[in-house]
Amino acid sequence: MMANFSRSVVTALVLMTAVAGPALAQVSKAFEAQFRKVAVDHCVSCHGPDLQRAGLRLDKLPAAFADKDTAAMWVKVLDRVSKGEMPPKNKERPPEKETQALLVNLRAQLHTASLTRQETEGRVVLRRLNRTEYETSLRDLLGTSVDVRVLLPDDNVAAGFDNVAAALDVSSAHLLRYQDAAEKALRTVIPSRPPTAFKERRTGKQITEKMTVWKDMLGKGARLDGDTLLLHVRPYSHIPCATAPVPQAGKYRVRASVYAVGTDGKPLAMRLVRDDQYGRNEADVLAIRDIPLGKPTIVEGEYDLRARQHVVFAGWSLPTMREAFGYGKKDTMIAGVGLAVEWVEIEGPIDVWPAAGYERLFAGVPLKATSEARAIAEGRPLPPNPPKRTPDSYAYDPLVPASAKPREDAERLLRAFLPQAFRRPVATALQDYYVKIVHDALDKKLPFGDAMLLGYKVALCSPHFLFITEPVDAARKEKATSLDSYAIATRLAYFLWSSTPDAELLQLAAKGELSKPEVLRAQTERMLKDPKGERFSTNFAGQWLDLRAINATSPDPQIYGEFDDFLFWSMPRETQMFFDEILRADLPLTDFVHSDWSFLNQRLANHYGIPDVVGGEMRKVKLTKESHRGGVLTQASILKVTADGTRTSPVLRGKWVLEKIMGLPPAPPPPDIAAIEPDIRGATTIRQQLDKHRNTVACASCHKHIDPPGFALETFDVIGGWRDFYRGTRGSPVELANYPGRKIFKGLAVEKGGETPEGKPFKDIDDYKQVLLADKDQLARNLAQKLLIYSTGADIQFADREVVEQLVAKSREKKYGFRSLLHDVVQSRVFLNK
């Protein structure tokens, strides 16, 4: 593990930072002479003129630390020597005292050069909003829930995140797509018609009468008891138990009277899905409700729906139609456990009209029918008794903003909008530029609403909106790279909300208050507690723990027949809620490695073999030791994203643990080394294959680190189930643990356990967790680095290591609390400087 900075190193850093340019050059020359002597005696046989292992030649490596590429080579040398990996153990090494003196000198040189670059160039280059940030910024700025992310090109990833400036390039495709996205979002702000009150209640019987295909269900997986519909299976997707589809987009109130039957006193898990595809998309699950036995219960909620969408109800713990009637089963009515639906009701839209977005863009400008707006713009009088409008009339005469003073209104609205969009005060000359765009459009007889949307669109596609600009605070002369208050507000907002600063942040920025530690801490707390704070958990944890990849693989149904959509939905929720709880309660970050609790529902608990968890709703559960669970490593979502749909790989999982949990990513494999393909015949075990692989010198040095955590996790299959043996494709079937009645083919025994690079043996994942927990500082170091990368949009640089070690020390003092670490990151030099 990476060693902490010693006092001698810190002292050297201070002294080296004070050295002037010419003196620094002399020190570099002195270091180069010192290093050359060591290199000739101990390094050039592998890294010299005749042989350059890892592409590194040390006898000619200049001490030009100001050059980024050269400095990067020196950092590799420093890290390998510091870890004791070089020179190799079977080679003669220089005296320890000589090595340490050299390392102290090298660290100081690298730190000084890196810090100098940061103080002159800044550590974060200009970065654009990624597509998630662009969408959330539009939503918050315009007050709309429009989905524009899908219109934008995928973002590249660097250092584990998609908001790192170095990877966020800009192409012509981006510029075109940003225009499309801005246009789509802006168009949703202007309603084409006033809302039409809509309310419809359907009894269970009426649900079946609305679609003739229900006749196929009745008498099989469903039946009627008077007006009540009893569902004993989950219907096919084209036979929904659903509300009426809504006529227009908006927020709707949904209610239903339901109860469970035949459940032996236990609740039945019911899901509500928003969809126009009849509930097939688990990503759009609105809620899970536990429905009690026999007692009619009113379930209600308020949900945003698009036109023609409806809300589908289904008993999620009921069998599917295929499970009930497929595979040669008799096609007869089934009874027993079921969901009784007395009625469903939908009402809305219940939003405030016009929506907040319209008020933000057109405050004080009334909405009128297009014909009336044209008359107002032309100065013609309106008819004294206009005909009463019907909903259909707005199809050919939609509502538009109608201004009697378009030039004055355009200037007023734009000058108010631009500082919000650009996240800081806007120079008058720049404001005039956007005002002129709209005035020119008005002069060309463009309707007022269209002219304003043109001005807004140009602003939302401008560099001032697309890029996060971070000017320094000119008033703080003692710190040439200190961010100004508006830059701090923006950095904090995109860190915690993935979006633009709100009014409170901008007001504090205007007063210069955000440079005060107590104010910054209070704002961090406020933002984490805000509903928008969920975006930090979703976007940071989604990338750190690879939850975004949960859909990347589909378990083979012939091998993992127990995998279903209920389990799939529950997997990432466990990890997301687990992350949220550690952050909310400032729990120690060691809980990410091991905990005696997690968030489960009945489906996930059954999968884990944990008893006494009833119902579909997720809740905090005490874990049993026998379950071998606790922390993120043993959660089904993580075990799924680190495997393919058929088999596991100790290499993939081991690499994941090194990168994500330990923060010690292995070097990429040599280009001429083939990947290991598991022997699907079962003749050769994965350990035997890896042992052979490790006989290659180029592979052994990395695999001694990769393989131990990988084999520690081999007792978990591709969907996170515990296993003592691999599944085969033939042979004698045995019953699958935790799934009574389900059979699988038994293969070879699972190979688990191993030995750490330091020679410490471990039996299984429970043992290996203790290996990780023995170095809490490294766990803190890893998370500190990842938070710094994500919060600033730049990878860790050498000068940042000093700050990272300061964060680790503070974390140790605060018992490794995760929320405390996040606060310290926000207060750090790296976060508050360009």
Predicted regions, residues:
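N-terminal secretory signal peptides that target proteins for export/translocation
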Residues: M1-R7
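Bacterial N-terminal signal peptides
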Residues: V9-G21
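Low-complexity, glycine/serine/threonine/alanine-rich intrinsically disordered linker
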Residues: Q26-L56, D69-K76, R80-E85, K89-K834
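Active-site donor-binding loop signature of nucleotide-sugar glycosyltransferases
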Residues: K60
